[in-house]
């Protein structure tokens, strides 16, 4: 059923992940991010943003 992909997931300081969030191998979530419940994170998230959706997209800047 395909090959295994192993890569670290990095979650920055002060980030929050909602319930049932999925993060794909190798993704970095920047500091101060909020990931909405049920989101699927398939690419890196820039710091201080609100991300939601499938796939997750930046929907709001949270400031510093």
For each feature predicted by the language model, list its residue ranges.
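Acidic, glycine-centered active-site loop in nucleotide-sugar glycosyltransferases
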Residues: 45-47, 52-55
